[in-house]
Design a protein with these regions (language model features):
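Mid-domain alpha/beta scaffold segments of enzyme catalytic cores
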Residues: 1-255
Length: 255
């Protein structure tokens, strides 16, 4: 059994995990040592802090996804600021741009991406970045504000990955890297040094091959990790050890 499996991006706070109280203990007993449970709305922000308060290996990222920011208020920022004082809140996220769905409008997305980047700087917290069909726009704001953090679920080019790395960011890979058509993600993973690499599920989404199409959970990181270990030319346990260390250093966690 593999140890030190750290899932740097999951959504166990969601309705898809009504069985979380049975599932999470099984995961912790099977090698999963830590999980960053990530919010996407104010509602899920509240749920994730409740979840991390109940489970020692679970930590929270709080913030509002670009598809949800159209309803954000000044009071929501006050709430985020207050919740960020909790000891198990370790990041602001997920925040960023989503030009694929574009549910909030691009100007509104930019406004709240910037406001949440400023909030993270004020709180001295790393950020978890969502970027879909907005690589250059995301890079431009990261270059402007220079946060610590991770661009999660990366599937962009190796060239853009190198530019993001120059800003001091980490890059996270999901089960997408196992897909047969994921040539860009594979090339990008090859370009990311081990000390900047994070591994994640984005569960319940993004189940890797050979489990694609079912609800994802952190146990499936053995498949994603196996592919990343193959790409990087390292032993799978060594990859888990290194990505655990990376996550703990980035998010200020002592395990």
């Amino acid at each position: 059994m593999y140890q030190n499996i750290f899932d740097s991006h999951a959504h166990y706070n969601g309705k898809e995990f009504a069985d979380r109280d049975e599932l999470l203990p099984r995961l912790f007993a099977s090698g999963v040592c830590g999980i960053i449970d990530v919010a996407s709305s104010m509602r899920s922000t509240r749920r994730t802090v409740e979840l991390s308060a109940r489970y020692g290996p679970v930590y929270s990222a709080i913030g509002v996804h670009p598809n949800e920011v159209k309803d954000m208020t000044d009071a929501d920022y006050d709430t985020l600021r207050e919740l960020a004082r909790l000891p198990k809140v370790v990041a602001i996220g997920e925040i960023g741009f989503d030009f694929y769905w574009d549910a909030s409008g691009r100007d509104t997305q930019r406004e709240h991406f910037e406001r949440q980047l400023i909030l993270a700087r004020e709180l001295d917290l790393p950020v978890i970045i969502h970027s879909r069909d907005a690589a250059q726009e995301t890079y431009d704001l990261l270059a402007k504000y220079r946060p610590r953090g991770v661009v999660h679920c990366y599937s962009g080019s190796a060239e853009m990955a190198q530019e993001i790395l120059k800003l001091g960011m980490h890059i996270g890979f999901t089960g997408v890297v196992t897909f047969k058509n994921a040539k860009k993600a594979v090339k990008a993973a090859a370009a990311v040094p081990l000390d900047r690499l994070l591994i994640e599920t984005d569960c319940p989404y993004m189940a890797p091959e050979p489990t694609r199409g079912v609800r994802c959970d952190s146990s499936m990181l053995v498949h994603t990790g196996g592919k990343l270990a193959e790409i990087k030319g390292v032993d799978l346990q060594d990859l888990f050890d290194r990505t655990r260390q990376n996550a703990c250093e980035l998010f200020g966690i002592e395990l």
